């Protein structure tokens, strides 16, 4: 069912772990290593419902495809997410939504954005290289932050660095001077 990354072969154990997390005790009997959980046994304190497979909850791929379909309908024009969601998450969403709706194409276009990188690494709380929007706004204007991201390719890692902010400030000054000159010319 690898539709978005068809030539990548078997999923690695790391990819499957990333995509599924810890499977509940009742879901160890997979028929194929690449099978994904449609229903998971709940951990203590998690929401759970009765089902023919026991008490539990939907797997996260089902959660996402159902929420998207509920709001947007049986077919989506554009579906977006981080580049790390291409496989297995988005492929799994496709597999189940296309099977449910009996369609060949649940989504027309996927946009997979690059991650935010700080000090050369993907931003992550666990790496302690994390910054909140509020913290960024204490040092930079919303316009500077927007320009910083607009100056980078959307599908590649986005760099948050002193140089990237400096480039954005320079562009902001350039635009401000340009539009100031245009206004002066129009006033005549």
Q: For each of these PLM feature ranges, what is it?
A:
Residues 1-185:
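Alpha-helical recognition segments enriched in aromatics with Gly/Pro capping
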């Amino acid at each position: 069912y690898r539709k978005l990354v068809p030539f990548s072969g078997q999923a690695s154990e790391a990819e499957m772990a990333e995509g599924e997390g810890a499977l509940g005790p009742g879901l160890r009997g997979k028929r194929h290593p690449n099978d994904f959980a449609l229903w998971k046994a709940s951990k203590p304190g998690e929401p759970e419902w009765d089902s023919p497979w026991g008490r539990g909850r939907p797997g996260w791929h089902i959660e996402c495809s159902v929420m998207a379909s509920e709001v947007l309908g049986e077919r989506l024009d554009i579906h977006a997410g981080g580049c790390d969601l291409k496989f297995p998450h988005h492929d799994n969403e496709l597999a189940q939504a296309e099977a449910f709706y009996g369609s060949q194409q649940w989504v027309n276009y996927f946009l997979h954005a690059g991650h935010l990188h700080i000090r050369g690494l993907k931003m992550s709380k666990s790496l302690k290289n994390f910054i909140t929007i509020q913290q960024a706004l204490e040092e930079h204007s919303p316009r500077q932050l927007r320009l910083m991201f607009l100056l980078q390719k959307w599908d590649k890692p986005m760099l948050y660095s002193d140089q990237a902010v400096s480039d954005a400030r320079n562009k902001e000054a350039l635009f401000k001077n340009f539009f100031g000159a245009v206004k002066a010319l129009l006033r005549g």
